[in-house]
């Protein structure tokens, strides 16, 4: 049997973050938690999700299972989520039973789980290759507030289609060029809430629209870790905090984006 309970707002925001990158996902569930990997249709970006069992309000998985889910369909279900809603997921071990049971309860309006909204969803067979993410040691890393990252990527996207990201000792520089305009922004270690480490100067160019899509995860995490090295995809990682404490959790949502070589 598989069952879990998770904060409704978090669960809804997670699928809202993914909706323009993936159409279908396989949530791989085992005793340690839920994992998911997926590529966008252009095969230039990769999503890596890991939610460990301790992050959930309740988690149980007696037998490994895969939940094939349509993102848009799940968002329709989660549209009733309110600020203090809780989501329950339940699935029997029977392999022939391709149904996910979902319960949604609003803690402010309902007194018990017996009053929850009950939904049954037929799982899909999301055809996904299992992807191996190579372990890379990045030369440069920058930690900053995720909201600041989101605000500036949106601004860059309004100016140009591509953004150059450069890192050197104590600084990260983002720049883009539009019609008769060039915008450059430098983030340095002496700025509030910025931490940069760099062992080798690196500069690469990326499609701005992907950074905007990734930045939607700012609703899930206060900080973002940007990692850069030559000739490999940039890593943009959002770590989740445990819901009842301020401690960082191994749970995360990480995006990888290939540098611009041609058009994509």
Swiss-Prot record:
Q: Which PROSITE patterns match?
A: PCNA_1
Keyword rRNA-binding, does the record have it? no
GO aspect biological process, one term: positive regulation of DNA repair
Q: Which Gene3D superfamilies match?
A: 3.70.10.10
Q: What is its main location?
A: nucleus
Induction conditions: Induced by DNA damage (at protein level).
Swiss-Prot/TrEMBL keywords: Chromosome, Cytoplasm, DNA-binding, Nucleus
- Per its UniProt record, what InterPro entries does this chain match? DNA_clamp_sf, Pr_cel_nuc_antig, Pr_cel_nuc_antig_C, Pr_cel_nuc_antig_CS, Pr_cel_nuc_antig_N
Compartments annotated for it: namely: Nucleus; Chromosome; Cytoplasm
Q: Which domain of life is it from?
A: Eukaryota
Q: Name one GO molecular function term.
A: DNA binding
GO cellular component, as recorded: chromosome; cytoplasm; nucleus; PCNA complex
Assembly:
Homotrimer. Oligomer. Interacts with ORC1 (via PIP-box motif). Interacts with FEN1.
- Function comment: May be involved in DNA damage response. Appears not to be involved in DNA replication in trophozoites.
Family according to the record:
Belongs to the PCNA family.
Q: What is this protein called?
A: Proliferating cell nuclear antigen 2
Native organism is Plasmodium falciparum (isolate 3D7)
Q: What is the lineage of its organism?
A: Eukaryota, Sar, Alveolata, Apicomplexa, Aconoidasida
Q: Which gene encodes it?
A: PCNA2
């Amino acid at each position: 049997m598989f069952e879990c309970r998770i904060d409704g707002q978090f669960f809804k925001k997670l699928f809202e973050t993914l909706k323009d990158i993936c159409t279908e996902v396989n949530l791989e569930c085992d005793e340690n938690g839920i994992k998911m990997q997926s590529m966008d249709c252009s095969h230039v970006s990769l999503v890596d999700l890991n939610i460990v069992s301790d992050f959930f309000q309740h988690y149980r998985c007696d037998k490994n299972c895969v939940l094939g889910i349509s993102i848009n369909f799940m968002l329709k279900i989660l549209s009733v989520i309110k600020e203090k809603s809780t989501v329950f997921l339940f699935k029997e071990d029977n392999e022939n039973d391709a149904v996910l049971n979902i319960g949604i309860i609003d803690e402010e309006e309902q007194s018990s789980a017996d009053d929850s909204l009950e939904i049954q969803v037929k799982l899909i067979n999301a055809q996904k290759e299992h992807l191996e993410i190579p372990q890379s040691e990045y030369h440069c890393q920058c930690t900053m507030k995720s909201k600041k990252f989101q605000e500036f990527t949106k601004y860059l996207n309004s100016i140009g289609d591509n953004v150059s990201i450069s890192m050197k000792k104590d600084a990260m520089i983002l720049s883009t060029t539009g019609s008769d305009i060039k915008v450059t922004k430098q983030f340095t270690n002496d700025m509030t809430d910025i931490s940069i480490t760099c062992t080798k100067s690196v500069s690469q160019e990326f499609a701005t629209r992907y950074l905007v899509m990734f930045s939607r995860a700012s609703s899930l995490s206060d900080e973002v870790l940007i990692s850069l090295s030559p000739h490999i995809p940039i890593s943009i990682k959002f770590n989740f905090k445990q819901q009842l404490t301020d401690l960082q959790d191994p749970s995360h949502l990480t995006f990888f984006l290939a540098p611009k070589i041609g058009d994509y």
